[in-house]
Amino acid sequence: EALEKDAEIHTLEINDEMEDFIRKYVSQSPDKDKIKLYFGDAMEIIPALDESFDLVFIDADKRLYSDYYDLIFDKLPAGALILADNTLWDGKVLEPLHPADKQTAGILAFNDKIKADQRVEKVILPLRDGLTMIWKK
């Protein structure tokens, strides 16, 4: 109901086991013609998209959050919003990092990148595992 007349939703899923499930529910949506589905590796799909996005939600491989951010940043106009999920990672971002914990290392690197990026305004909301809101200036 909140989707504007000319708006589109683009969604990426790497888990091919979810494809039938996702297609089933998208086909039931009154906005099904506005939903673009991509199945595969976001690191390959995102660079190929000739699109501009007003809102991006990142909830994927935590090791690659910084890479996803870099891939989408130039596809965002000023004022666009990025929502990054799990940025407090069950509190693990506050504990000493275990050398084998690549997921937490990825979240820490992402949080550091966002903190240092002067092109954006940002805030981490302490909701569940953390949600970071990032506005492009």
Regions from the PLM with identified roles:
Residues 1-137:
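S-adenosylmethionine/decaboxylated-SAM
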